[in-house]
Amino acid sequence: MRVLILAKEGERSETGTPPTPEAMAEHQTFNEELVKAGVVIGSGRLTPSAQGKRVTFDGKKRTVIDGPFAETKELVAGYWLWQVRSIDEAIEWLKRAPYDGGSFEIREVSMSEGA
């Protein structure tokens, strides 16, 4: 099954401050383990919401809103796309992740036709 892992953070992701070299090394090691196990399909870190846009839909009306999106307590800061046997396997991998804050949301990717 494919799952999308959404990394959610608060203010820390909005500052654009890079992690310490030690934290970067820990993240790199963890990502290498995921790749070696054949779990990772794709991944990425997102820029702060100040650089983003939001498009809202109301019937036929489309509205573009410039970031930052300060009204949101948690923002998506990054993602992984994984191939795993089960949600439980994804949870076990996430428990090993070298993070000291934020949260992760695991969502199964629908493989239905037309999706």
Predicted regions located by residue number:
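Conserved, structured core segments of small domains
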Residues: 1-115
